[in-house]
Amino acid sequence: MAKPNYGIDNPRFGLIIVLAVVAGLAFGLGFRKSSIEAVRAAASIILSLVPTGIILILLMVSYVKVEKFRHRDRMLGMTPWRGDEQVLDVGTGRGLLMIGAAKRLTSGKSFGIDIWRERDLSDNTQEAAMRNAEIEGVRDKVELRNADAREMPFPDGTFDCVLSNLCLHNTPTQEGRAAACREIARVLKPGGVAIISDFTHTDEYAKAFREQGMETTSSVSFLVAPMLLRIVKASKS
């Protein structure tokens, strides 16, 4: 039976770590017996970094295989579910949050938007997200749109819940991130909730939501290997 595959986050970073570890080992082994002091010193420095690289690789594997699913469930557990909600996942990638929300719905629907850049996630495509939805048995409860978080193709007050994990920091400017938060506030229904997780800029997000009249009800940190993630929860009155 096929299993869903939610990819490797920031695959270029992982590749750099792997290559650095391999290069360090190769360099150290190749020049270990050299009499040239400069080479010995360089080999010593590189080899000293190998354990750190190995630890980072193990932490990344832990995140890909275990921790990001726990973090998804943590986020989804921060709001009660009736089953009829309209949900939006901003930066859905291969659909982790979108599908997780869809599995909590009965008559509701879960939407995902993204621009699907390969550098953000391995095999980061709409097709991969829909394949996961099919495998998870929620194909009829999800819908994907190719859209930027700063300009969403939805009317005001469309969603009961907006979710996002490790997405908004990819917007390169503070104004751009604030624009994304304004869009999240705009598409939320009165009484709706935004649950936004990231490793940076979360104070900006909370401030932007408050400027839209939203109440920031929680802002907490979680160590999710290999990152410290913060969750901002904001409610629209």
Region spans (language model):
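Conserved class I S-adenosyl-L-methionine
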Residues: 83-93, 111
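Conserved beta-strand signature within the Rossmann-like core of class I S-adenosyl-L-methionine
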Residues: 191-198
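Helix-to-beta-strand junctions that scaffold the AdoMet/dcAdoMet cofactor pocket
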Residues: 105, 171-172, 188-190
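Conserved SAM-binding loop of SAM-dependent methyltransferases across substrates and taxa
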Residues: 94-106
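A short acidic, Gly/Pro-enriched loop at the edge of an enzyme's catalytic core
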Residues: 82-85, 150-162
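Class I SAM-dependent methyltransferase Rossmann-like catalytic core
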Residues: 2-18, 40-43, 52-76
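A short glycine-rich, Lys/Arg-flanked "PGG" loop and its adjoining helix->strand segment in the class I
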Residues: 177-190
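Core SAM-dependent methyltransferase catalytic element
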Residues: 212-237
